[in-house]
Amino acid sequence: KYMIMIICSLFVGTIAMQHLAESGIIITDQMPFGWDNPLFGKELGLNWDTILPEATKKLESDGYKLFSAIVSMMFFSGVLKSLAGPAPNYDCQKILSTKSPEEASKMSGFISIILLPIRYFMVMGLCVLGILFFKDLALSHHADGINFESIMPAVINKYLPTGLVGLVLAGFLGAFMSNFSGTLNAGQAYIVNDIYLKYFNPNAERKQIINMGYLSGIVMVILGIGLGLLIKDVNMIFNIITAGLYGGFVCANVLKWYWWRFNANGYFYGMLFGIIASAIPPALSVTGITNYFDGTRMLYFFPIFIVIQLIACILGSYAAPATNKETLIKFYKDVRPWGFWKPIHDEIALTEPTIEKNKNFKTNMLNVFLGITGQILLTLLPMYLILSKWTSLGIVLALFFVIVLIMRKTWWKRLTDY
Protein backbone atom coordinates (compact mmCIF):
# COMPACT_ATOMS: atom_id res chain seq x y z
CA LYS A 1 0.00 0.00 0.00
CA TYR A 2 2.72 2.45 0.95
CA MET A 3 4.70 1.65 -2.20
CA ILE A 4 1.60 2.50 -4.24
CA MET A 5 1.37 5.85 -2.44
CA ILE A 6 5.06 6.55 -3.08
CA ILE A 7 4.65 5.86 -6.81
CA CYS A 8 1.49 8.00 -6.96
CA SER A 9 3.15 10.88 -5.10
CA LEU A 10 6.21 10.86 -7.34
CA PHE A 11 4.09 10.79 -10.50
CA VAL A 12 1.72 13.55 -9.33
CA GLY A 13 4.55 15.82 -8.18
CA THR A 14 6.53 15.23 -11.38
CA ILE A 15 3.49 15.96 -13.58
CA ALA A 16 2.93 19.21 -11.65
CA MET A 17 6.57 20.25 -12.11
CA GLN A 18 6.35 19.47 -15.83
CA HIS A 19 3.15 21.50 -16.33
CA LEU A 20 4.60 24.39 -14.31
CA ALA A 21 7.80 24.43 -16.37
CA GLU A 22 5.92 24.22 -19.70
CA SER A 23 3.52 27.01 -18.75
CA GLY A 24 6.33 29.49 -18.16
CA ILE A 25 4.26 30.94 -15.31
CA ILE A 26 5.89 32.14 -12.11
CA ILE A 27 3.28 30.75 -9.79
CA THR A 28 3.95 33.21 -6.98
CA ASP A 29 2.89 36.02 -9.35
CA GLN A 30 -0.56 34.42 -9.55
CA MET A 31 -0.95 34.25 -5.77
CA PRO A 32 -1.24 36.81 -2.94
CA PHE A 33 1.99 38.35 -1.67
CA GLY A 34 3.56 36.13 0.98
CA TRP A 35 1.88 32.92 -0.22
CA ASP A 36 5.24 31.11 -0.49
CA ASN A 37 6.51 32.38 2.87
CA PRO A 38 6.13 29.86 5.74
CA LEU A 39 6.26 32.71 8.28
CA PHE A 40 3.21 34.74 9.26
CA GLY A 41 2.09 37.45 11.65
CA LYS A 42 -0.95 37.90 13.85
CA GLU A 43 -3.23 37.29 10.87
CA LEU A 44 -2.75 35.06 7.85
CA GLY A 45 -1.99 38.14 5.75
CA LEU A 46 -3.00 36.82 2.33
CA ASN A 47 -5.14 39.24 0.32
CA TRP A 48 -7.30 37.28 -2.12
CA ASP A 49 -9.75 40.13 -2.85
CA THR A 50 -8.44 40.94 -6.34
CA ILE A 51 -7.49 37.37 -7.26
CA LEU A 52 -10.33 35.20 -5.95
CA PRO A 53 -12.86 36.93 -3.64
CA GLU A 54 -14.52 33.58 -2.84
CA ALA A 55 -11.26 32.49 -1.18
CA THR A 56 -11.42 35.46 1.19
CA LYS A 57 -14.96 34.55 2.18
CA LYS A 58 -13.96 30.91 2.70
CA LEU A 59 -10.99 31.79 4.91
CA GLU A 60 -13.16 34.08 7.03
CA SER A 61 -16.05 31.61 7.33
CA ASP A 62 -13.68 28.79 8.31
CA GLY A 63 -12.02 31.05 10.89
CA TYR A 64 -8.49 31.08 9.48
CA LYS A 65 -8.06 34.85 9.34
CA LEU A 66 -6.58 35.09 12.86
CA PHE A 67 -4.03 32.45 11.94
CA SER A 68 -1.61 33.01 14.83
CA ALA A 69 -4.28 32.07 17.40
CA ILE A 70 -5.10 28.87 15.50
CA VAL A 71 -1.45 27.85 15.24
CA SER A 72 -0.94 28.64 18.94
CA MET A 73 -3.85 26.40 19.93
CA MET A 74 -2.61 23.64 17.63
CA PHE A 75 0.91 23.97 19.03
CA PHE A 76 -0.42 23.86 22.60
CA SER A 77 -2.50 20.77 21.86
CA GLY A 78 0.43 19.20 19.99
CA VAL A 79 2.78 19.65 22.96
CA LEU A 80 0.24 18.04 25.29
CA LYS A 81 -0.32 15.15 22.88
CA SER A 82 3.44 14.64 22.68
CA LEU A 83 3.71 14.65 26.47
CA ALA A 84 0.91 12.08 26.59
CA GLY A 85 2.97 9.61 24.57
CA PRO A 86 1.40 7.16 22.10
CA ALA A 87 -2.35 7.57 21.84
CA PRO A 88 -4.42 4.67 23.25
CA ASN A 89 -5.28 3.35 19.77
CA TYR A 90 -3.33 1.64 16.99
CA ASP A 91 -0.41 4.05 17.64
CA CYS A 92 0.10 2.34 20.98
CA GLN A 93 -0.13 -1.06 19.30
CA LYS A 94 2.68 -0.07 16.90
CA ILE A 95 4.86 1.04 19.80
CA LEU A 96 4.23 -2.16 21.75
CA SER A 97 5.02 -4.30 18.69
CA THR A 98 8.67 -3.18 18.74
CA LYS A 99 11.33 -5.18 20.57
CA SER A 100 12.62 -2.43 22.87
CA PRO A 101 12.14 1.22 23.85
CA GLU A 102 15.12 2.06 21.64
CA GLU A 103 13.47 0.47 18.58
CA ALA A 104 10.17 2.18 19.44
CA SER A 105 11.93 5.56 19.39
CA LYS A 106 13.60 4.80 16.06
CA MET A 107 10.31 3.65 14.54
CA SER A 108 8.55 6.80 15.70
CA GLY A 109 11.31 9.01 14.31
CA PHE A 110 11.55 7.27 10.94
CA ILE A 111 7.80 7.65 10.37
CA SER A 112 8.21 11.42 10.00
CA ILE A 113 11.28 11.12 7.76
CA ILE A 114 9.58 8.66 5.42
CA LEU A 115 6.02 9.95 5.51
CA LEU A 116 6.18 13.76 5.37
CA PRO A 117 8.21 14.35 2.16
CA ILE A 118 6.22 11.76 0.20
CA ARG A 119 2.86 12.99 1.45
CA TYR A 120 3.49 16.67 0.74
CA PHE A 121 5.09 15.98 -2.64
CA MET A 122 1.65 14.77 -3.75
CA VAL A 123 -0.21 17.49 -1.83
CA MET A 124 1.86 20.27 -3.39
CA GLY A 125 1.61 18.66 -6.82
CA LEU A 126 -2.18 18.66 -6.66
CA CYS A 127 -2.09 22.23 -5.30
CA VAL A 128 0.05 23.48 -8.21
CA LEU A 129 -2.14 21.74 -10.80
CA GLY A 130 -5.21 23.27 -9.17
CA ILE A 131 -3.69 26.76 -9.33
CA LEU A 132 -2.49 26.43 -12.92
CA PHE A 133 -5.79 25.14 -14.29
CA PHE A 134 -8.27 26.61 -11.80
CA LYS A 135 -10.32 28.40 -14.48
CA ASP A 136 -10.58 25.21 -16.56
CA LEU A 137 -11.86 23.00 -13.73
CA ALA A 138 -15.53 22.06 -13.56
CA LEU A 139 -15.97 22.83 -9.87
CA SER A 140 -19.18 22.26 -7.97
CA HIS A 141 -20.91 25.13 -6.19
CA HIS A 142 -23.08 25.49 -3.10
CA ALA A 143 -25.01 28.32 -1.49
CA ASP A 144 -21.84 30.06 -0.28
CA GLY A 145 -20.10 29.92 -3.67
CA ILE A 146 -17.35 27.64 -4.97
CA ASN A 147 -16.95 24.28 -3.27
CA PHE A 148 -13.19 24.36 -2.80
CA GLU A 149 -13.17 20.74 -1.67
CA SER A 150 -14.03 19.73 -5.25
CA ILE A 151 -10.69 21.06 -6.56
CA MET A 152 -8.66 17.95 -5.73
CA PRO A 153 -11.02 15.38 -7.32
CA ALA A 154 -11.41 17.66 -10.36
CA VAL A 155 -7.62 17.90 -10.79
CA ILE A 156 -7.18 14.14 -10.38
CA ASN A 157 -9.95 13.41 -12.88
CA LYS A 158 -8.80 15.87 -15.56
CA TYR A 159 -5.03 16.19 -15.43
CA LEU A 160 -3.73 12.78 -14.38
CA PRO A 161 -3.33 9.94 -16.91
CA THR A 162 -6.07 7.29 -16.82
CA GLY A 163 -3.90 4.53 -15.37
CA LEU A 164 -2.46 6.85 -12.74
CA VAL A 165 -5.96 7.93 -11.66
CA GLY A 166 -6.76 4.31 -10.83
CA LEU A 167 -3.48 3.95 -8.96
CA VAL A 168 -4.09 7.15 -6.98
CA LEU A 169 -7.60 6.04 -6.04
CA ALA A 170 -6.28 2.61 -5.05
CA GLY A 171 -3.67 4.31 -2.88
CA PHE A 172 -6.24 6.58 -1.24
CA LEU A 173 -8.55 3.63 -0.57
CA GLY A 174 -5.66 1.60 0.80
CA ALA A 175 -4.63 4.43 3.13
CA PHE A 176 -8.23 4.84 4.28
CA MET A 177 -8.76 1.12 4.86
CA SER A 178 -5.55 0.66 6.84
CA ASN A 179 -6.35 3.64 9.06
CA PHE A 180 -9.98 2.59 9.39
CA SER A 181 -9.23 -1.05 10.18
CA GLY A 182 -6.48 -0.15 12.65
CA THR A 183 -8.76 2.24 14.55
CA LEU A 184 -11.68 -0.22 14.44
CA ASN A 185 -9.57 -3.12 15.70
CA ALA A 186 -8.21 -1.02 18.55
CA GLY A 187 -11.73 0.09 19.50
CA GLN A 188 -13.02 -3.47 19.49
CA ALA A 189 -10.13 -4.61 21.69
CA TYR A 190 -10.85 -1.91 24.28
CA ILE A 191 -14.59 -2.62 24.37
CA VAL A 192 -14.18 -6.39 24.63
CA ASN A 193 -11.16 -6.62 26.96
CA ASP A 194 -11.52 -3.53 29.14
CA ILE A 195 -15.31 -3.32 29.45
CA TYR A 196 -17.09 -6.56 28.51
CA LEU A 197 -14.64 -9.07 30.03
CA LYS A 198 -13.70 -6.93 33.01
CA TYR A 199 -17.11 -5.73 34.18
CA PHE A 200 -19.88 -7.72 32.50
CA ASN A 201 -18.78 -11.28 31.73
CA PRO A 202 -15.32 -12.17 33.08
CA ASN A 203 -15.90 -15.89 32.42
CA ALA A 204 -17.14 -15.50 28.85
CA GLU A 205 -16.53 -18.37 26.45
CA ARG A 206 -14.49 -17.95 23.29
CA LYS A 207 -17.59 -17.81 21.08
CA GLN A 208 -19.16 -15.10 23.27
CA ILE A 209 -15.99 -13.02 23.08
CA ILE A 210 -15.88 -13.33 19.28
CA ASN A 211 -19.56 -12.38 18.97
CA MET A 212 -19.06 -9.35 21.22
CA GLY A 213 -16.14 -8.29 19.03
CA TYR A 214 -18.33 -8.53 15.92
CA LEU A 215 -21.17 -6.64 17.63
CA SER A 216 -18.96 -3.83 18.90
CA GLY A 217 -17.39 -3.48 15.45
CA ILE A 218 -20.78 -3.26 13.74
CA VAL A 219 -22.01 -0.64 16.22
CA MET A 220 -18.88 1.50 15.75
CA VAL A 221 -19.13 1.30 11.96
CA ILE A 222 -22.80 2.34 12.04
CA LEU A 223 -22.02 5.25 14.37
CA GLY A 224 -19.10 6.28 12.17
CA ILE A 225 -21.20 6.23 9.01
CA GLY A 226 -23.93 8.22 10.74
CA LEU A 227 -21.42 10.82 11.92
CA GLY A 228 -19.93 10.98 8.43
CA LEU A 229 -23.32 11.79 6.93
CA LEU A 230 -23.70 14.70 9.37
CA ILE A 231 -20.24 16.18 8.77
CA LYS A 232 -20.44 19.33 6.65
CA ASP A 233 -16.88 19.61 5.34
CA VAL A 234 -13.26 18.61 5.89
CA ASN A 235 -12.70 21.61 8.15
CA MET A 236 -15.32 20.29 10.58
CA ILE A 237 -13.59 16.89 10.66
CA PHE A 238 -10.29 18.61 11.44
CA ASN A 239 -11.80 20.55 14.34
CA ILE A 240 -13.67 17.58 15.79
CA ILE A 241 -10.49 15.47 15.81
CA THR A 242 -8.10 18.21 16.96
CA ALA A 243 -10.21 19.98 19.57
CA GLY A 244 -12.87 17.39 20.37
CA LEU A 245 -11.44 13.88 20.40
CA TYR A 246 -7.89 14.81 21.45
CA GLY A 247 -9.20 17.33 23.97
CA GLY A 248 -11.20 14.55 25.57
CA PHE A 249 -8.32 12.28 26.56
CA VAL A 250 -5.04 14.17 26.36
CA CYS A 251 -4.90 15.43 29.97
CA ALA A 252 -5.50 12.01 31.54
CA ASN A 253 -2.80 10.50 29.35
CA VAL A 254 -0.32 13.23 30.29
CA LEU A 255 -0.78 12.85 34.05
CA LYS A 256 -0.22 9.08 33.98
CA TRP A 257 3.48 9.69 33.23
CA TYR A 258 4.30 12.66 35.45
CA TRP A 259 2.26 12.42 38.69
CA TRP A 260 2.73 9.55 41.09
CA ARG A 261 -0.68 10.02 42.81
CA PHE A 262 -2.62 9.57 39.57
CA ASN A 263 -4.55 6.30 39.48
CA ALA A 264 -7.14 4.36 37.47
CA ASN A 265 -10.01 6.17 39.18
CA GLY A 266 -8.61 9.55 38.14
CA TYR A 267 -8.01 8.25 34.63
CA PHE A 268 -11.60 7.03 34.33
CA TYR A 269 -13.24 10.23 35.54
CA GLY A 270 -10.82 12.41 33.59
CA MET A 271 -11.60 10.55 30.37
CA LEU A 272 -15.34 10.51 31.13
CA PHE A 273 -15.77 14.22 31.83
CA GLY A 274 -13.21 15.21 29.20
CA ILE A 275 -14.97 13.30 26.44
CA ILE A 276 -18.42 14.52 27.53
CA ALA A 277 -17.26 18.16 27.60
CA SER A 278 -15.41 17.95 24.29
CA ALA A 279 -18.26 16.09 22.58
CA ILE A 280 -20.88 18.78 23.26
CA PRO A 281 -19.68 21.40 20.70
CA PRO A 282 -19.31 18.87 17.82
CA ALA A 283 -22.71 17.37 18.67
CA LEU A 284 -24.38 20.79 18.60
CA SER A 285 -22.65 21.60 15.33
CA VAL A 286 -23.23 18.39 13.34
CA THR A 287 -26.88 18.16 14.41
CA GLY A 288 -27.51 21.70 13.22
CA ILE A 289 -28.69 22.97 16.62
CA THR A 290 -26.24 25.86 16.32
CA ASN A 291 -23.52 26.96 13.92
CA TYR A 292 -21.62 28.81 16.66
CA PHE A 293 -18.88 26.17 16.71
CA ASP A 294 -18.44 26.02 12.93
CA GLY A 295 -15.10 26.97 11.44
CA THR A 296 -12.15 26.88 13.85
CA ARG A 297 -14.03 28.29 16.85
CA MET A 298 -14.15 24.84 18.42
CA LEU A 299 -10.37 24.92 18.65
CA TYR A 300 -10.49 27.92 20.99
CA PHE A 301 -12.38 25.82 23.54
CA PHE A 302 -9.52 23.30 23.77
CA PRO A 303 -8.08 24.91 26.98
CA ILE A 304 -11.54 24.72 28.60
CA PHE A 305 -11.74 20.99 27.83
CA ILE A 306 -8.28 20.58 29.37
CA VAL A 307 -9.25 22.41 32.59
CA ILE A 308 -12.45 20.35 32.99
CA GLN A 309 -10.52 17.14 32.45
CA LEU A 310 -7.70 18.18 34.79
CA ILE A 311 -10.14 18.90 37.63
CA ALA A 312 -11.87 15.55 37.05
CA CYS A 313 -8.52 13.73 37.03
CA ILE A 314 -7.36 15.29 40.31
CA LEU A 315 -10.65 14.82 42.15
CA GLY A 316 -11.04 11.29 40.82
CA SER A 317 -7.51 10.37 41.89
CA TYR A 318 -7.97 11.61 45.44
CA ALA A 319 -11.37 9.91 45.68
CA ALA A 320 -9.62 6.53 45.64
CA PRO A 321 -6.48 5.12 47.28
CA ALA A 322 -3.16 5.58 45.53
CA THR A 323 -1.79 2.81 43.34
CA ASN A 324 0.09 0.24 45.42
CA LYS A 325 3.69 1.17 46.14
CA GLU A 326 5.15 -1.96 44.53
CA THR A 327 3.66 -1.01 41.15
CA LEU A 328 4.76 2.63 41.45
CA ILE A 329 8.30 1.66 42.47
CA LYS A 330 8.64 -0.80 39.58
CA PHE A 331 7.31 1.77 37.10
CA TYR A 332 9.67 4.47 38.37
CA LYS A 333 12.72 2.21 38.24
CA ASP A 334 11.89 0.97 34.73
CA VAL A 335 10.79 4.25 33.13
CA ARG A 336 12.52 6.86 35.33
CA PRO A 337 10.03 9.62 34.42
CA TRP A 338 10.58 13.27 35.23
CA GLY A 339 7.78 15.12 36.97
CA PHE A 340 6.08 14.84 40.37
CA TRP A 341 7.64 11.58 41.59
CA LYS A 342 9.63 12.76 44.62
CA PRO A 343 7.80 10.59 47.24
CA ILE A 344 8.46 7.45 45.20
CA HIS A 345 12.07 8.41 44.49
CA ASP A 346 12.70 9.08 48.19
CA GLU A 347 11.20 5.72 49.16
CA ILE A 348 13.39 3.85 46.68
CA ALA A 349 16.43 5.82 47.89
CA LEU A 350 15.99 4.31 51.37
CA THR A 351 17.01 0.90 50.03
CA GLU A 352 18.90 1.99 46.90
CA PRO A 353 20.83 5.16 47.79
CA THR A 354 22.58 5.25 44.40
CA ILE A 355 19.38 5.70 42.39
CA GLU A 356 19.38 8.95 40.42
CA LYS A 357 16.58 11.14 39.13
CA ASN A 358 16.05 11.65 35.43
CA LYS A 359 18.25 14.65 34.62
CA ASN A 360 17.55 14.71 30.88
CA PHE A 361 14.66 17.18 30.93
CA LYS A 362 16.59 19.99 29.21
CA THR A 363 18.00 17.61 26.60
CA ASN A 364 14.56 16.16 25.97
CA MET A 365 13.07 19.63 25.48
CA LEU A 366 15.91 20.53 23.10
CA ASN A 367 15.17 17.39 21.10
CA VAL A 368 11.47 18.26 21.03
CA PHE A 369 12.25 21.72 19.62
CA LEU A 370 14.68 20.30 17.07
CA GLY A 371 12.24 17.54 16.15
CA ILE A 372 9.38 19.98 15.54
CA THR A 373 11.65 22.19 13.43
CA GLY A 374 12.87 19.16 11.49
CA GLN A 375 9.31 18.04 10.74
CA ILE A 376 8.45 21.52 9.45
CA LEU A 377 11.52 21.45 7.21
CA LEU A 378 10.58 18.00 5.89
CA THR A 379 7.16 19.42 5.00
CA LEU A 380 8.67 22.44 3.20
CA LEU A 381 11.21 20.34 1.31
CA PRO A 382 8.89 18.88 -1.39
CA MET A 383 6.97 22.15 -1.67
CA TYR A 384 10.03 24.18 -2.63
CA LEU A 385 11.20 21.35 -4.91
CA ILE A 386 7.97 21.39 -6.95
CA LEU A 387 7.95 25.20 -7.11
CA SER A 388 11.61 25.09 -8.28
CA LYS A 389 12.60 27.60 -5.59
CA TRP A 390 16.17 26.39 -5.40
CA THR A 391 17.51 28.96 -2.93
CA SER A 392 14.77 28.21 -0.41
CA LEU A 393 15.26 24.47 -1.02
CA GLY A 394 18.98 24.80 -0.33
CA ILE A 395 18.34 26.66 2.93
CA VAL A 396 15.84 24.00 4.05
CA LEU A 397 18.29 21.18 3.25
CA ALA A 398 21.13 22.94 5.07
CA LEU A 399 19.04 23.55 8.19
CA PHE A 400 17.76 19.97 8.16
CA PHE A 401 21.31 18.64 7.84
CA VAL A 402 22.39 20.72 10.86
CA ILE A 403 19.44 19.39 12.90
CA VAL A 404 20.33 15.81 11.93
CA LEU A 405 23.93 16.31 13.11
CA ILE A 406 22.80 17.78 16.44
CA MET A 407 20.13 15.15 17.10
CA ARG A 408 22.57 12.39 16.24
CA LYS A 409 24.43 13.44 19.38
CA THR A 410 21.53 14.55 21.61
CA TRP A 411 18.98 11.86 20.63
CA TRP A 412 20.21 8.97 18.46
CA LYS A 413 23.25 8.09 20.60
CA ARG A 414 21.27 8.48 23.84
CA LEU A 415 18.25 6.32 23.04
CA THR A 416 19.22 3.83 25.74
CA ASP A 417 19.30 6.59 28.39
CA TYR A 418 16.30 7.33 30.58
What role is predicted for each listed range?
Residues K1-Y418:
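Membrane-embedded helix-loop-helix hairpins and adjacent transmembrane boundary segments
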